Amino acid sequence: MDVIISTLAVFWLILAIFFILIKRGLWIFSDVSKSLSMFMLEKALGPAIDFVSGRPGSATTAWIIHGFDWTFAASTVTFVGLWLTHDPTALHSFESWGYHPKSSELIYAGRLTALFGAIGMMVIGASLHALPKLSGTNLASESNATLVSLLWTLSVLLMFIGSQNSVILGITILPVANLLLSLASIAIVINMVITVSEATKDIPFPGWLILFAVIGNIAAILAVFVSGAYEEGTGQWLHFHLSGGTFFFCGLAGGIMGGLIGYID
C-alpha cells in the first residue's frame, strides 16, 4: 500500500510541475531549444519523414484510421477469448502449429489493444485536431505526428504479442512495447508543447486535459521507477492504471469538449 501511495504522489507531482512550467510561459523553450526540438521531430528522422504527408489534418486522419483498425482487432480478439471461455477446445487445431490460445490471455490482449490501440489512437487523433484549434495555431509537425502513429501501432502490436508470449528469444516483450510507447508519447508531447508555445490565445480547460492525457504515460513511467514500484513487482499494474486512466478520461473529455468548442467557434 505504501508503494502505491508514494507512486500516486510522485505521479501528481510530475503533472503539477508540468502545469507550472507551461503556465509560466515555457521558459525552457527558447528559440534554440525550439529549433532543436523541431529538428528532432523532422530532419533528425532522415528519409523516413519524406514518406509521410505533412498537409494539415494528415496526422489526425492517420491516427484515427489506425484507431479504427485496432477497434476491429480488439473486438475480434475479445470475441475469440469469450468464445474459448464457453468452449475451451474450439481452437485446438491451432496446437498443431505450436499455438495454444487461452481465454484469459486473449481477453487481456483485447483489453490492451482496445485501450492503447483503438481508444488511444482515436483520442490522440482527436487531440491533434482539437489542441491547435484551441490554441489558435497549427500543429508544429504534421509529418512527425503521422510517422509516430506507425511507432505507436508497432508498440500495441508488441503488447498483443507479449500478452500471448511474455518472453521471446530471451527478450521480455512488454517492457519493449512500453519503451516504444514511451518514445511515441515523448514525440507527441514535444509536438503538442511546441504547438502550445506558439498559441495566440490562452489555453482553455479542454486543452489542459489533452496535455495531461499525453503526459500521463511518461509521468506514470517516471513515478513507477522513482517510487520503487518497479522493483516491488507492481510496476506494470500501476503503470497500466495510471497512464490508462489519465489518458482515457482526460483525453476523451478534452477531445470531446475541445471539438465542441472548435465547432462552435
Regions picked out by a protein language model, each given a short descriptive name:
Residues 1-265:
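Hydrophobic alpha-helical transmembrane segments of multi-pass integral membrane proteins
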